[in-house]
């Protein structure tokens, strides 16, 4: 299996969530029994935290309504695009490889004055919003989240709050977010904005990881929030139609008082969902955000893994270490089997193009999703007590989807925790072909746990992931 996983994460969940921690029980080789958690939005945050209190009072009651579409979507595109695509990871002839290419100003300790020269070289004339949306839609993605402003402080939209934006500071003289919003609306793709509310290395008073390195960055953070954050967020929430998601990041210095200034702005978009990175305590938000990792087990809250296709978020010309499409599909399935969403990143070039290796892989993922999307959209975590060694399991109502990554050499697919009676197993890609059961046995460790064995043909229908449907599943 080619998917990325990690030990159980402690990732600072939303105020409404706790990370389930439990010990797996050893069983037969290749089978690990784990208690299946239940999902809820029960308040488990610190009741003395004022940000948590404000969130619960103002947005907690509407959480279930607001996240319904997101739970159905399961798969989205993250876009890290900004003026950092001009140096593309290189500054004064040196590859700045620490962190993603979007961090070049910080990691290269580039002065504000020097960085402000980059927009003059940023003219992404090949940008085509419709093409980008088509790439996402054809890959099976249901929503897009794009960097409206990253930590460098450069706004990728026409902002009246700061001239350091793509419309006023570049020869491009267009608002790509406006064009993207229109293209998304036409294609029925939901659009969200990433906004760096704390770190801002260009505007005085903005925070910086590791501290300021240029006197031009010094200033009052509260004034920065008043003069830059609030007006820009108002612009994003007022001028671009329906905004589905706001994706905050790195809440350095985001005290309860500062959070209290920004939370009311969400009311400009009553249906918007917010991640858990607005405040330093991660006490607010609708969902948790493991980054570049997939939790070993399901979480007790809504969650979304964001991940790159190579080693960087923003475009770095030298980074050609691309994950294969097989890995991307397996990651998507692994995440869905644990009740999460997958936000997969692309880093467009300074010309406005999504790199071809990303496009190629998304086409491959899309081909798989065209046949098997039913096993991802609107599914919930696996109900089985074991993560099978051969793949993953998703569920929708009384239907199970067995995702077979590793085809058994002997043709016998062992499904722990499943007892088939009158249920019929068929291939999702070929519903007319029944998959016969070779019988039901019981675990040698726990006799109450049934193990069904399915007899598979010699070769998989899809070498990446062959999906088998079992309808009429009832929890034992």
Regions found by a protein language model. Give the residues of each.
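Bacterial N-terminal signal peptides that target proteins for export
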Residues: 1-12
């Amino acid at each position: 299996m080619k998917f990325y996983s990690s030990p159980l994460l402690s990732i600072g969940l939303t105020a409404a969530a706790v990370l389930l921690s439990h010990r797996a029980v050893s069983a037969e080789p290749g089978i690990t029994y784990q208690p299946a958690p239940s999902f809820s939005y029960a308040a488990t945050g610190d009741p003395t935290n004022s940000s948590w209190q404000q969130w619960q009072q103002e947005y907690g009651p509407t959480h279930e309504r607001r996240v319904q579409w997101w739970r159905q979507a399961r798969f989205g595109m993250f876009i890290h695009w900004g003026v950092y695509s001009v140096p593309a990871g290189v500054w004064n002839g040196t590859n700045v490889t620490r962190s993603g290419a979007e961090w070049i100003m910080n990691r290269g300790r580039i002065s504000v004055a020097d960085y402000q020269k980059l927009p003059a070289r940023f003219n992404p004339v090949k940008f085509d919003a419709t093409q980008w949306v088509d790439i996402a839609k054809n890959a099976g993605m249901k929503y897009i989240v794009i960097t409206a402003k990253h930590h460098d402080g450069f706004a990728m939209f026409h902002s009246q709050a700061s001239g350091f934006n793509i419309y006023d500071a570049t020869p491009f003289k267009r608002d790509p977010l406006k064009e993207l919003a229109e293209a998304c609306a036409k294609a029925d793709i939901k659009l969200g904005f990433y906004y760096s509310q704390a770190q801002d290395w260009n505007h005085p008073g903005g925070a910086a990881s590791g501290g300021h390195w240029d006197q031009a960055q010094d200033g009052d953070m509260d004034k920065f929030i008043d003069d830059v954050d609030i007006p820009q967020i108002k612009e994003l929430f007022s001028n671009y139609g329906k905004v589905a998601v706001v994706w905050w990041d790195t809440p350095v210095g985001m005290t309860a008082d500062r959070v209290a200034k920004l939370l009311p702005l969400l009311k400009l978009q009553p249906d918007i969902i917010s991640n858990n990175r607005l405040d330093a305590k991660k006490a607010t938000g609708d969902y948790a955000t493991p980054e570049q990792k997939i939790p070993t087990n399901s979480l007790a809250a809504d969650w979304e893994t964001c991940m790159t296709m190579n080693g960087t978020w923003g475009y770095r010309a030298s980074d050609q270490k691309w994950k294969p499409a097989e890995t991307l599909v397996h990651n998507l399935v692994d995440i869905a089997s644990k009740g999460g969403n997958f936000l997969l990143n692309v880093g467009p070039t300074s010309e406005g193009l999504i790199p071809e290796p990303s496009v190629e892989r998304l086409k491959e993922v899309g081909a798989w999703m065209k046949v098997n999307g039913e096993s991802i959209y609107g599914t919930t975590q696996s109900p089985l007590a074991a993560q099978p060694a051969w793949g993953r399991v998703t569920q929708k109502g009384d239907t199970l989807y067995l995702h077979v990554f590793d085809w058994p050499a002997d043709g016998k697919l062992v499904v722990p925790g499943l007892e088939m009676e009158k249920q019929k197993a068929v291939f999702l890609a070929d519903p007319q072909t029944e998959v016969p059961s070779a019988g039901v046995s019981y675990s040698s460790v726990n006799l109450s746990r049934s193990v069904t064995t399915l007899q598979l043909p010699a070769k998989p229908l899809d070498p990446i992931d062959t999906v088998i449907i079992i309808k009429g599943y009832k929890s034992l």
